[in-house]
């Protein structure tokens, strides 16, 4: 089977090597086509949500005796709920995450993919499966002033993204090792404003409005680490939401706005959004697409997406066939 279902909801499918690794994690279980009659509960990352929903719909068509419920809530919710951390909600069988586990949430066993919960029910373990690759997309309104601006520049650098999104002053960025003359060659020296014209004289004299996920999101955390380098000042004020559609609407409603979210939501809105090319580690401006996300050239914003299965014999009777169905069968891959 192909990778059409993964691609159809806006993700990039695993490489052959990654698929082989995931298959080895299922080894010895010889999953049947459908698990025993019952239910599967899934919650977590809003980025993984479209894929989880697509797999659930397809699996229930093939296995009508299985009921699959899917909720969002963010990666922290996915980690917490599969570990039965009541502060994050009711326990689930599968926790979705668009980031890796934190050392405060779980400890990794020697095999590398089973994790012991450290918060919630500490007798619980979770098995981590990579299900797709995401290219975190930095977007502006297609054809708008910001689009024209960045197009003329060829793209943006990670340091420019840090200046745009961070609450750090120019002096603090300089102390952190950034060259402000390269970031804002037309800078106005005013830390209270962040204008497109500071990036290039040909760009509009308009304040850069921000749209980004809330702090419970793995997407927020990934960008915070990869672009802001966990700067203690955090993000500048902007439109924050756990609903990616709110972020899309914010960006499409303001030519001077810039936002970021998972590749799936960019793919859903290609008619109204442009994803900015970002300078990678080789010095090339690269936009996210199926090829650049998969081969890693869209760095530093390519990242793995995960589903984490509760390690419990009765639960795994249903969740392992579901995972095998999603990752390896024609029906799961080619809706």
Please place each PLM-identified region on the residue numbering.
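Flexible loop/hinge segments at secondary-structure junctions
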Residues: 1-335
